[in-house]
Every structure is written in structure tokens, then in C-alpha cells.
Amino acid sequence: MKLAELKDHMQKSVEATQRSFNTIRTGRANASLLDRITVEYYGAETPLKSLATIGTPDASTIVIQPFDMGSIGTIEKAISLSDLGLTPNNDGKVIRLNIPPLTAERRKELVKVAGKLAEEGKVAIRNIRRDAVDEVRKQEKNSDISEDEARDLQEEIQKLTDQSTKRIDELLAAKEKDITTV
């Protein structure tokens, strides 16, 4: 495995963790809160953003305008069944989600959720590192590379791993600050 390829894999894990963080609710309205929601539409699970326009007219409201008015009921149901804790208001044309301020208890829960997501990202990075180190050891065993080259590669792999986990820690700190800021 080439170092550039390895760096790319680790970067993708960091980006996936960032996207996961975006789905965690803070006190402000954000359309990415609805990224994980899928709706049963003509027998298939379809992402909500494929079925409607999602906007945030102000800091405490999300407005969902379905492309097909026949799907408004199923969209409303999918939001109600999600773990977001939001109650949809359907006026027949659009669905409004009012984002209530978070309680201190809910903020603590969300910080824990963010911590779990960060840990999942770090595990993914460690798995990438493990696979890369195994590959280097295999090449060394087959005499494709020298012992010194293997050691240098393993050090480079570790540097990339440290950079990626540090980036996830930075993202986590920023998300925790965002969640706990009233």
C-alpha cells in the first residue's frame, strides 16, 4: 500500500467522522440534522434530501418542502420515528421542525454520542494502520524490502495515524464546544 493511498484512506475516515458529527443536534437549526433520515417511498428506503427541499429560515426552524405532496405523511412519520426528538408540524404543503433549546442533561448525552462517534473514527483509522503495517511486514518477510525500509515505512504509517487521530480529537473538541455552548 502506498503512503498516499494510506493517507487518502485515513482522510476519508476523518471526513466520515465529520459527517457523523454533523448529524448531532446542537441548539441551532441545521439541515444536516436530517442527513441520516430515510423515508419509505414507493417500497424503497430513500434519503429525505432526495425527496424534499430542506431549508433553515431562522436559527430555530427547519422547513421541509416535499417535491411530491403525496409523500408528506411518510416524511412526517419518518421524522417522528427518528431519534432526533423533534416533532414535525405538517400544514399540508411544508413540514416545520421547531428546534427547542437543549436541556443540560440532553447536552451531556450528545457529548457522549459525539465521543462514541469519534472513537469509531479512531478505530477505523487504527484498522487502516494495522492493515498497512501487516502489509509492510509481509513485504519484509518476502524480502521485497529491507528491515530499515520496513521500519521507516512503519514510522511514516504511525505519523499518518497520529495526524488523523489528532484531527478527529480536534473535531470532537469543536463539536463538544458547539453542543455545550448555550
From Swiss-Prot:
Gene3D superfamilies: 3.30.1360.40, Ribosome-recycling factor (1.10.132.20). GO terms for cellular component: cytoplasm. Its main location: cytoplasm. The keyword Protein biosynthesis applies. GO terms for molecular function: ribosomal large subunit binding. Pfam families: RRF (PF01765). It comes from the Bacteria. The keyword Protein biosynthesis applies. It is found in: Cytoplasm. Keywords: Cytoplasm, Protein biosynthesis. GO terms for biological process: translation; translational termination. NCBIfam families: frr. PANTHER family: MITOCHONDRIAL RIBOSOME RECYCLING FACTOR PSEUDO 1, RIBOSOME RECYCLING FACTOR. Belongs to the RRF family. Responsible for the release of ribosomes from messenger RNA at the termination of protein biosynthesis. May increase the efficiency of translation by recycling ribosomes from one round of translation to another. This is Ribosome-recycling factor. It comes from Synechocystis sp. (strain ATCC 27184 / PCC 6803 / Kazusa).
